[in-house]
Amino acid sequence: DTKGETVVYIDKKEVFKTNGGKETFDAQLPLGTYDVYVKCICGGNDWGYTLECDTVEFESAARVKGTDDVWMYIGTFVNDFEFPFDTASDMLHIVGEPATYWRLDAPDTFVRPYNENTLFGRWNYPLGVTMYGLLHTAIAIGSEDIKNYIKDHVQLCIDTLEYALWDKEQYGGATSIHNLLTSIDSLDDCGSFASMMLEVNKYLGLRDVKKVADYVGDYIYNHQSRLEDGTFFRKEMMHHFHNMTMWAEDLYMSVPNLVRNSQFTGDQKYLDDAANQFFGFKKRLFMPEEKIMSHVYDFKYDSKTNVPWGRGNGWVVFSMTELLEVLPEDHPKRNDLIEFLNTLCEGYLALQDDEGMWHQVLNDHESYPETSCTSMFIYAFSRGIRFGWLKNPEKYVKAIYKAWKGISKTSVDSNGNVYGVCRGSEFSFIADYYKYELGWNLNDTHGTGIVMLAGIEVIRLNKFLAE
């Protein structure tokens, strides 16, 4: 029973059309589950339909909490609007211009999607690291299943951004998907995952990657807070405690993305920006006596904290090798970067313990052995050897194998569980915060991907030395 012209589609194919009134029709289909769409065109002053089936029951196309309704509605659209079945049916996209989304048969009752999975389809910095390690592991072992998992994860994040931005505009506040990308106030929110996204696109190919790459690239290059010399720092943050600070790990949150954005766009300015960041951070965070980096510089006190957090230091040299791999040989900052890399690696080498590990507080071996920073030093040392950046490479080869033995002994069990990865950090001028309060988590996503990357680098180093 319809009011006005009505068209019924089953799995995107038109099966029935009427100009209104009560009618019946048959649709013979093999056993299975099918999507049913009804296009209802306003007839006079009213529209609507009733669709009943004698042989099967309808069920909702999505699990919508709080209702038993089986029909959802979307519209209104102009009469000649071509409905995008492929994108609208997955319920990941807004539809039309102006945009709208699915709703129930009640006034202003829109359906609002949620991603309740903490590890799949999520966009955050630790998962960016995890997927990066997983990608190169999948390539190394030739696993199509893992490649497909990574691609599906990242593609879901790309596909839902447009909806998430609309969701925030409609309802305000944090969105139930992409709450970081829709409320960016730091490099943490965008740089790590976007860098990994571009790496996945390079190897596996993704749809519509440019719109997200441009969105993140614009924030990092044009909107992220900078000092007068162009160095990134934290200002006007949601977490006010972070205001007016500079964090060592922000080199990872920015530089790899700038590197890949330069490759993606062909624009040299991103590489120049990446190179300059290291010297701005060095000016504020470098601890020359030990040749390592302080975790944070607090501009409110015009002082660095002088606490060398392990993972923060790991991110510095990790990111430097990402840049040096693609920085042109004639770049004016290249030689200075290589010299800085050698200086830092000398400092880190001196702080390796007898079991091969580096510690949560690098210069305090009474703090716990920390897996993610140990993995990053393996990664940076190996790349420094393979690309010829490190002087006296023999001592670093020895340190790498010693560290990998330490990780194999204490950090990874026979089931692949990863131990000893520090959880997400705040900062302090007091080393005891890192030593006693900032503990580690089992299988923490801040470190699982890094352990995989370290393992890949050990394999690459073996091949390099054999040749």
Map each language-model feature to its residues.
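Flexible, glycine-rich surface segments
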Residues: 323-327, 334-387
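Structural helix-adjacent loops and short alpha-helical linkers that scaffold large soluble proteins
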Residues: 136-151, 199-217, 261-275, 323-343, ...
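Beta-strand-rich ligand-recognition modules
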Residues: 3-53
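Active-site lining segments of carbohydrate-active enzymes
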Residues: 92-96, 114-118, 236, 241-245, ...
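CBM-like carbohydrate-recognition segments
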Residues: 95-105, 118-124, 140, 156-211, ...
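Beta-strand-rich domains and repeat architectures in extracellular enzymes and scaffolds
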Residues: 109-140
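An acidic-aromatic loop/edge-strand motif
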Residues: 37-92
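Long, well-ordered core segments of solenoidal/helical folds
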Residues: 88-117, 149-169, 211-233, 268-294, ...
